[in-house]
Amino acid sequence: MSRGFVREGDQEEVPLVPQRAYLPAGVPNFVTREGLEQLLKEKEELISERENLGVTNENEKRIEQNYLNAKLHLLNDRIAEARVVEITVQPPEEITFGATVTLKTGLSGNMQTLRIVGVDEADIAQGKISFISPLAKMLINKKVGDKVTLKRDRQDIVFEIIGIECK
């Protein structure tokens, strides 16, 4: 787009806003109750940040407001599409969205606990994996004692399901 006939002050850059966690088109945005609360809290924080900008330069303030407005727009879209899945109504004997799963890893026998959550909630450091992740997709509808094999590069990793908790 040509920018030849604009005022000098109007030549600010459009803010680049990082996209939210990937959610394929047409896939419902399932979230846990905690996940929705987390999204709403993030919205409150962004609104507060936008209202309390410490920038005195008008041009910088407008750029920062545009950036925060763009982030809010993406967040509002995600909240509007959110579908809360009540974990307490899930069958306790099989893995479903929101379940916490204890796995034993193949030959090493290492134990690992993971919870299957929404894309915006996923954080492997906290043991939370997205329901669209390859491992979560393999675990859904499995039961205690079942095994799943995750194919990685040159190695297959076998996970045995040791426990399932829905709370």
What spans do the regions from the language model cover?
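Helix-rich terminal scaffold detector
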Residues: 1-78
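Residues that recognize and position ribonucleotide moieties
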Residues: 29, 94, 157
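Active-site phosphate-binding and catalytic loops of NTP-dependent enzymes
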Residues: 80-91
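Non-DNA-binding regulatory cores of transcription-related proteins
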Residues: 89-151
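Short, Lys/Arg- and Gly-enriched loop/turn segments at beta-strand edges
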Residues: 110-114, 155-163
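Short, compositionally biased
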Residues: 119, 161-167
